Every structure is written in structure tokens, then in C-alpha cells.
């Protein structure tokens, strides 16, 4: 694995977010959203990829990978830090993608340094005693980092019991003002459903869900939010409004009306985000913010999600804005080039 370690160290020095090792291909990395090669890197053989992966897996994980042909897990490499890993079979052999994780959870102030409005709204949401906050976006948009930043703020401000359910655990939270228990699906508990059901009996104040993936997880999250818990969950969606539809589509049609009522009652807000390249060479998040105002709650209850857009467009003073308004604000501040904003705006 020594070659892997050398490459991972080089990737971190160049600010890479992801590293790719694949049979029959040279190693690659993603820097500021762009895929690029390592200097003078040679093609990986099947044996090299297999040996490196084998060194990272526990005996239990090897059995899992042998049976399912793919696996998600997280590791900590001495002197290099933590990585989220996905390994899979492909037509040419093995592929391994490593996401570089920070040594400690990100600070909300850092993630929202260019966006005072998003910072204020997220802090307000974190101070709620109960309800549901959704972190939405496409893969690789940074929603897990924003969720972790909010958990860290809760952990550092006040005495609350936080239970996380993750697959895998990405950021490690040390109990500070309160108490944090992190559970990894497949390692500490069999499934999201089982972990969420158990969490309701473990006297939490805050329940953090890596992703709402199925009917039962959605139902349990809504139940938890309705019964006095603050629930922070992620979902994959194309915008904040689409998050509402995606969440409800996970529930069987016969139960959807009831779930819609629970969501309308318990929702605090939805933050949708995307990452853009900055003028200075890094990346910055653009945050779309949907607040569960009385008007928004009524539109959810009445199954009129598309009418929520007009409420967002006119609700800036109430802590709401669309992704297009967020993109324009970054361009106006000179943080992101206007041509870049135009390209991203077409995608949303």
C-alpha cells in the first residue's frame, strides 16, 4: 500500500477532494471539481489495486465485499487523516474512490464565510428543539459537510444528546457541551430503519440521519420530528422544492397524505446547495434556503409544491431565496465569475 500512501499524500498537498485508483488506469484525483492526473503516474495493475484495498478492509468487510461486489466505509490513515472509501467491481477489475475528509468537523462559520444570510438561517434552525431540517443537493455538493457543521455547532453550544446514523461515519464528533453517539450502519447497527427505531428509545434530543433512503426511514424521521426531536437528514434532489417531492415519493401512495401532513407540521427548513469554482481558485457553496413558513406549510399540506417557488422568490427578508438568487449574490460579490454563474444557473 506504500504507493497508495504516497499518492494520497500528494493528493492532499494539492487540495484534492477525491482520489481514484482503478485497474488498468493511472491514478487520478479531483481538484476544485476538475479531474486530473498525477505527474509521472503509471497504470495500476489488478494485483496492486486488490492488495491496496485488502489492506484497508477488515475481515468482516472483506466478506461483505466478496458477497456484494461493492462497499462503502471510512478509514483513518496515520498522518494523512480520514477518508470515505467506495470500492466496486468494474469490467476491467477493481475501482476504489477515496473522498478526503477533514480531521475534524468543519466550522459553520467557515462554510458560510461568503454568505451571512445562510449562516444566520442555519444557526436559527440548529437552535430549534424539534422539527426536521433537510440538507439537499446532488452527489459531491458538500451537504454532508454542512450537516456535520450544524451538528458540531449543536454539540458545542448547549447540553443536548445527539445520535447520528451514518453509512459510513465521515466526521468524528467528540462530545463537548453535550453528548454525541455515532452509529455506523453495517458495523454498529444492521440498518437505518433499526437504528432510527432504536434512537427513539435512547432519549436523544437530536437525531442525525446520513440519508433518508426508504419508506420506513422517512416515516421514522417524520415521527421523531413530530414527537419532540430535532432531526437533521440529507437527501438527493435537484432543488429544495424537489426535496419535498422526493421525500414524499418514498412513502406508499396510500400513506402519502398522512406523511404530507406530518411533513407540513414538522418541517423547519430545507437547504439545497451546490459548489462553484471561485475567482481565487477554490470552491464556494451556493445555498438555496426554504423556510417552513405558514404559507409553505399550507402548500405542502395541499400538495402544491410548485407554488412554493413564488413564496421563495419573494421571501428573501424572511430568510428564503432560490438557488438562482444565491448564485447571483456570489457573482455580485465578485466571488464567482458571472459566466460561471450563468453556466450553473442553466443546470437548476
Question: Would you name each region that the model predicts?
Answer:
Residues 1-348:
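Short, flexible helix-loop junctions that flank or precede catalytic/ligand sites
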Amino acid at each position: 500500500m506504500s504507493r497508495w500512501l504516497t499518492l494520497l499524500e500528494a493528493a492532499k498537498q494539492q487540495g484534492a477532494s477525491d482520489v481514484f485508483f482503478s485497474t488498468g488506469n493511472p491514478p487520478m484525483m479531483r481538484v476544485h471539481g476538475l479531474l486530473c492526473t498525477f505527474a509521472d503516474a503509471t497504470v495500476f495493475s489488478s494485483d496492486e489495486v486488490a492488495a491496496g484495498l485488502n489492506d484497508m478492509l477488515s475481515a468482516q468487510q472483506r466478506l461483505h465485499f466478496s458477497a456484494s461486489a461493492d462497499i462503502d466505509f471510512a478509514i483513518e490513515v496515520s498522518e494523512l487523516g480520514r477518508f470515505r472509501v467506495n470500492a466496486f467491481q468494474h469490467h476491467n477489475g477493481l475501482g476504489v474512490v477515496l473522498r478526503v475528509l477533514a480531521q475534524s468537523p468543519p466550522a459553520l462559520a467557515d462554510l458560510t464565510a461568503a454568505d451571512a444570510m445562510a449562516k444566520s438561517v442555519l444557526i436559527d434552525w440548529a437552535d430549534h428543539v424539534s422539527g426536521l431540517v433537510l440538507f439537499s443537493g446532488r452527489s459531491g455538493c458538500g451537504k454532508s459537510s454542512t450537516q456535520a457543521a450544524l451538528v458540531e455547532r449543536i454539540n458545542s453550544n448547549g447540553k443536548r444528546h445527539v445520535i447520528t446514523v451514518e453509512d459510513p461515519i465521515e466526521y468524528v464528533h467528540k462530545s463537548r457541551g453535550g453528548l454525541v453517539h455515532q452509529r455506523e450502519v453495517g458495523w454498529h447497527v444492521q440498518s437505518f430503519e433499526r437504528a432510527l427505531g432504536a434512537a427513539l428509545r435512547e432519549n436523544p434530543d437530536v437525531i442525525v440521519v446520513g440519508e433518508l433512503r426508504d419508506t420506513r426511514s422517512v416515516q421514522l424521521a417524520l415521527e421523531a420530528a413530530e414527537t419532540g426531536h430535532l432531526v437533521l437528514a440529507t437527501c438527493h434532489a435537484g432543488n429544495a422544492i424537489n426535496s419535498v417531492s422526493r421525500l414524499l415519493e418514498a412513502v406508499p401512495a396510500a400513506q402519502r397524505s398522512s406523511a404530507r401532513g406530518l411533513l407540513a407540521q414538522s418541517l423547519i427548513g430545507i437547504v439545497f446547495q451546490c459548489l462553484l469554482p471561485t475567482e481565487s481558485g477554490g470552491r464556494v457553496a451556493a445555498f438555496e434556503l426554504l423556510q417552513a413558513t405558514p404559507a409553505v406549510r399550507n402548500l405542502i399540506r395541499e400538495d402544491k409544491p410548485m407554488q412554493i417557488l413564488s413564496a421563495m422568490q419573494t421571501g428573501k427578508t424572511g430568510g428564503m431565496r432560490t438557488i438562482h438568487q444565491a448564485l447571483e449574490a456570489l457573482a455580485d460579490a465578485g466571488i464567482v465569475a458571472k459566466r460561471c454563474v450563468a453556466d450553473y444557473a442553466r443546470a437548476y
